């Protein structure tokens, strides 16, 4: 076959065939299909084409890489050339100004030598302008007058921009400002670039050529970024002034290029002049030679004073000190907070034993500005507006750097605000669904876990700042109040049963005890915050029991209970046993009869259930509320039995009522008194007095005197 050649020769021929200018893919495929013997030839040809494709791809990658490197080098050379051309242009401009000044000086000298010739030249130039005015038109004064004239058009900048001999206008022009997020036009501004700062002013709508002050940016903290053209947005550049940025649009590409070049050159000249000034100020100045004196004691005084003069010279020409402000800007921009604080510590250590001279004060002023910027960034890192994910450890970096900057109080305040927002968000995100007890379990787990983690992180971050712990205690109390609000809203405001409320409070107390592992006991706080709601719940449930007891008393027939089945009787025995009534068998009769009234049995079970649930809620502040509620409940039953005993005329029913009264006084009341003393830890005199009042009924059952 013509195309089935060796691997090497076939590959080179195939390459030449594909690279030829007259190559036609359709004709090539048609010819290939006609000359192939079968599928195998086509597969081999396909493999050769794939190998050629891979080889071509690798060659293309190598060429792209080589060209890319050449492109980078070319762009760098162009940038260098552009910078040199601009410097050359600047030098030529200065030379032109010098030559004009020299020419003007020579003309003035010639005019002095020949007044008649000077008068003729002045009249020819401008007959209305006196010669003395032209003599005052020196280069520096011209710049100063131009700056003053322009700034007179800007309202509100006279006090912010005091005139100084070295300040002059470099460049100015109109720009359009755009929103950085939506790229929408905001306003038209006029920018004044001076040799040490950039002034931005907005145009006044009703006054042509007049402006209002908007912002002033020192060149040291200003960065210029070219914005790539993206039609219709073009001819734009961005100014970065930490922590904000602004985007401006020039009238055309030429003006944009001029702005970029002039800004960079002015920044560079400013940095060089500042560096030279610091170097000159850092050089030790020779002490003035004192006049000779015949006093022999002055020599010793001079020898003692010489070292102090040497000590006043602080060497600020070190490279790392010169670059310190820029290095701090880089660290802040790159979020290298540790590196920035390390640089500040290094500077403070270097200047610790040095005298405070004027150059040191100026350096301190620059560094203090960066410290304020760094502090603002760290404060923003700890603000609740930031993401609250990651737990309290996510704030450790910013907190530790603020503490190193000597702002532990601010770090403590921001840390606690951040954690308060995190706890509040976590509680709000809990879904209220299912049983109340299930929600309370979730609520307690979320809140107390967050509180425990915050306490441990606080102890780690502020280990050496004992003064901050009082702030944490105040924060913990405030957080506990937020937790109790959510807890009470779900448990007490929704009118849950007393048993459910007791279980929920028990869960909260158990979680609160976990904080004692780190030495934080907030039990008294949760008691103080819950006491009002628990009092309301106890009184509400007491009223329910009293109403139910009165309703049963109104329907009382004083008949024995018939439980019908042994199972029901056994169940009642178990219920009474769980209530603490161990001698209940003496009140049971034959078959399934019970020698007690249904009303008295129901009252016993309800009262003991109330006491058990109330004891789960008990703490000392609730002592009198619980005791008074018990007395009120018992009095309702006691008064009813006493009244029925005095009013009943049937001897058989009267004996049955007396049997119920005996059960109430001799069995139920001692059980209530004993259980109350076990739960509270001390006896209740009111319950003892109530039980002793039953003696009156036992001594004189026919008396009409009430037990109350």
From Swiss-Prot:
Q: Where in the cell is it found?
A: Cytoplasm; Cytoplasm, Perinuclear region; Cell projection, Growth cone; Cell projection
**Feature: compositional bias, Acidic residues:** 297-314
**Which BP terms from GO are recorded?**
exocytosis; Golgi to plasma membrane transport; protein localization; protein transport
Alphabetical keyword list: Cell projection, Cytoplasm, Exocytosis, Protein transport, Transport
- The main location class comes to cytoplasm
Q: Which InterPro entries match?
A: Cullin_repeat-like_dom_sf (IPR016159), Exo84 (IPR033961), Exo84_C (IPR032403), Exo84_C_1 (IPR042561), Exo84_C_2 (IPR042560), PH-like_dom_sf (IPR011993), PH_domain (IPR001849)
Region Disordered: list its residue ranges.
Answer: 271-314
Question: What's one GO-annotated cellular component?
Answer: growth cone
Q: Where along the chain is composition biased (Basic and acidic residues)? A: 271-282
Q: Which residues form the PH domain?
A: 168-268
Enumerate the Pfam families for this protein.
Answer: Exo84_C, PH_EXO84, VPS51_Exo84_N
Hey, which family's this protein in? Belongs to the EXO84 family.
Its quaternary organisation is: The exocyst complex is composed of EXOC1, EXOC2, EXOC3, EXOC4, EXOC5, EXOC6, EXOC7 and EXOC8.
Q: What role does it play?
A: Component of the exocyst complex involved in the docking of exocytic vesicles with fusion sites on the plasma membrane.
- Name recorded for this polypeptide: Exocyst complex component 8
Q: What is the lineage of its organism?
A: Eukaryota, Metazoa, Chordata, Craniata, Vertebrata
């Amino acid at each position: 076959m013509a195309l089935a050649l060796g691997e090497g020769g076939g590959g080179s021929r195939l390459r030449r065939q594909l690279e030829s200018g007259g190559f036609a893919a359709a004709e090539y495929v048609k010819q290939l299909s006609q000359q192939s013997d079968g599928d195998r030839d086509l597969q081999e040809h396909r493999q050769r084409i794939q190998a050629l494709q891979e080889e071509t791809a690798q060659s293309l990658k190598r060429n792209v890489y080589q060209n890319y490197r050449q492109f980078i080098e070319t762009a760098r050379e162009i940038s260098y050339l552009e910078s040199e051309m601009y410097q050359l242009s600047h030098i030529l401009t200065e030379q032109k100004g010098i030559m004009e000044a020299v020419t003007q000086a020579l003309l003035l000298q010639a005019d002095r030598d020949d007044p008649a010739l000077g008068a003729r030249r002045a009249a020819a130039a401008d007959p209305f302008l006196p010669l003395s005015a032209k003599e005052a038109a020196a280069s520096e004064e011209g710049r100063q007058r131009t700056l003053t004239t322009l700034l007179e058009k800007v309202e509100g900048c006279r006090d912010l921009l005091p005139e100084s001999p070295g300040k002059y206008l470099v460049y100015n022009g109109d720009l359009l400002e755009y929103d950085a997020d939506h790229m929408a036009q905001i306003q038209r501004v006029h920018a004044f670039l001076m040799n040490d700062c950039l002034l931005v002013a907005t145009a006044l709508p009703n006054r042509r050529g007049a402006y209002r002050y908007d912002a002033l940016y020192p060149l040291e903290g200003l960065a210029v970024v070219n914005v790539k053209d993206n039609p219709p947005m073009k001819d734009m550049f961005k100014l970065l002034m930490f922590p904000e940025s602004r985007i401006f649009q020039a009238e055309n590409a030429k003006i944009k290029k001029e702005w970029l070049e002039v800004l960079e050159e002015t920044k560079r000249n400013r940095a060089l002049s500042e560096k030279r000034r610091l170097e000159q100020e850092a050089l030790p100045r020779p002490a003035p030679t004192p006049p000779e004196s015949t006093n022999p004691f002055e020599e010793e005084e001079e020898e003692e004073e010489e070292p102090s003069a040497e000590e006043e010279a602080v060497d600020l020409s070190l490279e790392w000190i010169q670059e310190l402000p820029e290095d701090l800007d880089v660290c802040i921009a790159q979020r290298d907070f540790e590196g920035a604080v390390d640089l500040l510590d290094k500077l403070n250590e270097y200047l610790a034993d040095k005298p405070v001279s004027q150059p040191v004060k100026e350096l301190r002023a620059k560094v203090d500005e960066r410290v304020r910027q760094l502090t603002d960034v760290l404060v923003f890192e700890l603000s609740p507006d930031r993401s609250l994910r990651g737990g309290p450890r996510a704030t450790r970096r910013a907190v530790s750097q603020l503490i190193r900057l000597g702002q532990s109080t601010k770090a403590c305040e921001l840390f606690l605000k951040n954690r308060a927002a995190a706890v509040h968000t976590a509680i709000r995100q809990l879904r209220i669904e299912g049983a109340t007890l299930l929600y309370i379990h979730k609520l307690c787990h979320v809140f107390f876990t967050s509180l425990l983690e915050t306490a441990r992180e606080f102890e780690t971050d502020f280990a050496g700042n004992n003064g901050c712990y009082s702030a944490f205690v105040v924060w913990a109390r405030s957080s506990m109040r937020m937790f109790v609000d959510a807890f009470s809203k779900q448990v007490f405001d929704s009118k849950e049963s007393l048993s459910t409320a007791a279980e929920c409070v028990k869960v909260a107390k158990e979680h609160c005890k976990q904080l004692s592992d780190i030495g934080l006991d907030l039990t008294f706080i949760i008691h103080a915050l819950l006491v009002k709601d628990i009092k309301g719940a106890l009184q509400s449930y007491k009223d329910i029991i009293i109403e139910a007891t009165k309703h049963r008393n109104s329907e009382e027939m004083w008949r024995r209970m018939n439980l019908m089945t042994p199972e029901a009787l056994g169940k009642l025995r178990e219920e009474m046993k769980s209530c603490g009534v161990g001698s209940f068998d003496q009140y049971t009769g034959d078959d399934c009869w019970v020698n007690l009234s249904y009303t008295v049995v129901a009252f016993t079970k309800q009262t003991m259930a109330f006491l058990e649930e109330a004891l789960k809620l008990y703490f000392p502040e609730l002592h009198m509320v619980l005791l008074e509620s018990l007395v009120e409940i018992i009095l309702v039953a006691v008064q009813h039995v006493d009244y029925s005993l005095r009013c009943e005329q049937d001897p058989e029913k009267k004996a049955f009522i007396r049997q119920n009264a005996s059960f109430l006084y001799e069995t139920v009341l001692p059980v209530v008194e004993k259980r109350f003393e076990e739960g509270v830890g001390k006896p209740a005199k009111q319950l003892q007095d109530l039980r002793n009042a039953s003696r009156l009924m036992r001594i004189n059952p026919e008396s009409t005197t009430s037990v109350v």
